[in-house]
């Protein structure tokens, strides 16, 4: 536990991250994909036995795995990249990861456990967030499935998956639950401006729905650098009531945003809420040590409502 906290602290305080890189196809020049190691619980080979789901196994989800007594949904990552929310019943079997070894990355984020079927693990890469840029909004990323890109080596790039988008696609009923929850929250009376830093299109849509329902003014930025530039430009900080920031973002991380705001005498009083899918104790403790005013597991509507009501009152 202490080792995990030290590792997390070292990476975040230096504006760095580590990504597990993997491939979905056997070709030598196959595209590489990645995800933050802090969202990964373990990597396993399963025996191929999966509890099937109603409606068959021709969609994104293959069924359920039993991992250490826990039933976890198994997703074929290649199928998900070809999934279109406008055609949810499409047969995706032809897009499957073709592998007899049943290699699976078991993940935990946003209070969800999920198993991802991939073809091959490459290695972990260590990057500064300044070396990471936003993913192009074209091709398979038209629906926001890629949050960022970075270099694997001189010749190849890694596409970082937007796991928040994956969760919303795999569990569409969560959106219905969110819509019901939104009906239960009341508007907050405040003229203060809310600044949001979020690179995930899926997560940003949820946040925007929340603040719009609360009838609050806001501006959203795709990364922490743009938020900070705006905050200190023309003394905009005088109009701001609270900052909500993700942790994983191209250019600079949410922890860097938090550190900068709290270290500047002009903004040290400004409430900063961390909204992250990386909900480990080590991340929470680091946020608290850096004087974050709140930590929300992305994006808990009721918790965000309560924190905004408290900070804006």
Curated annotation (Swiss-Prot):
Domain CheW-like: 16-172
Modification 4-aspartylphosphate occurs at: 246
Keywords in alphabetical order: Phosphoprotein
Residue span, Response regulatory domain: 193-313
SUPFAM superfamilies found in the cross-reference section: CheW-like, CheY-like
Pfam families: CheW, Response_reg
Example GO BP: chemotaxis
Keyword Phosphoprotein: yes
Entries under Gene3D superfamilies matching the protein: 3.40.50.2300, CheA-289, Domain 4, SH3 Domains
Changes after translation: Phosphorylated; probably by transfer of CheAY phosphate group.
Deletion phenotype: Deletion mutant is fully chemotactic and forms swarms the same way as wild-type strain. Mutant shows however defects in mouse colonization.
UniProt function note: Plays a role in chemotaxis signal transduction system in order to colonize the host stomach. May act as a phosphate sink to control the flow of phosphate to CheAY.
Identification of the protein by name: Chemotaxis protein CheV2
Lineage start: Bacteria, Pseudomonadati, Campylobacterota, Epsilonproteobacteria, Campylobacterales
The gene coding this protein: cheV2
